[in-house]
Amino acid sequence: AHYDSTSLSQGAYDNMSGSVGLLGIAEHFARIPHRYGLRFIWCGSEERGLLGAKAYCRDHEEDLKKIVLNINLDMIGCIMGKFIACVTAEEKLCNYLNYLGLEKGFSVSVSQDVYSSDSTPFADKGVPAVSFARIAPPNTGTIHNSYDTVALMSGEQMVKDIDFICAFADRMANAVRCPIAREMPDNMKEKLDIYLNRKRDKK
């Protein structure tokens, strides 16, 4: 999650919500055992081009080889909108999240794509990644400006969003073997190249 915002914004939705959500998940795992080591990372300068996440990946290349999954929170817990999971990894993870949503009775819209957030530098280094957000067209008009205040947020919705992310993280952190392949599929490599301006989109 990134903790920075823009100069005109209070940044409650983008991205105090993700920063607080990550803290809640850290508190959750502080109380329960888990098989895998967990690293909680708050990044700066996301709004200036993912600079914090890029710097972390640059400075921790050896550590990245041990990371099996990146979970990113960027804009959750708002009053309205649909909850999304953007998977930059193999398509099987999309299926996993869809089934988990059904199991938990939680509505989640899952896609395989590149998300414009801190998960992308990790994915570009080969780390499977998923970004969680709650978005709606009206909400996107309230970020990066003075309308991004706590008035957009819902404590009840925040708890529901974090509960689902915790349920997913629990399964990953306590898996006997991580079910997600530690490789980036070719279609995601191409999308990363396009997003990072290394290749032109043919469409």
What are these regions, as identified by a protein language model?
Residues 12, 16-20, 47-51, 88-91, ...:
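Soluble non-cytosolic domains of exported or imported proteins
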Residues 1-50, 165:
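Alpha-helical metal-binding/catalytic segments enriched in His/Glu/Asp
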Residues 7, 33-34, 43-142:
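Metal-dependent peptidase/peptidase-like ectodomains
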Residues 18-21, 25, 52-53, 93-96, ...:
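Stable alpha-helical elements in mature extracytoplasmic
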Residues 12-15, 55, 144-146, 184:
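Composition- and surface-driven signal marking solvent-exposed, interaction-prone regions
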Residues 20, 27, 31, 139-203:
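His/Asp/Glu-rich mid-to-C-terminal helical/loop segments that flank catalytic regions of hydrolases
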Residues 1-5, 75-77, 147:
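Short, histidine-centered active-site or binding-site loop motifs used for metal coordination
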Residues 35-45, 72-73, 178-190:
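Acidic/histidine-enriched alpha-helical segments
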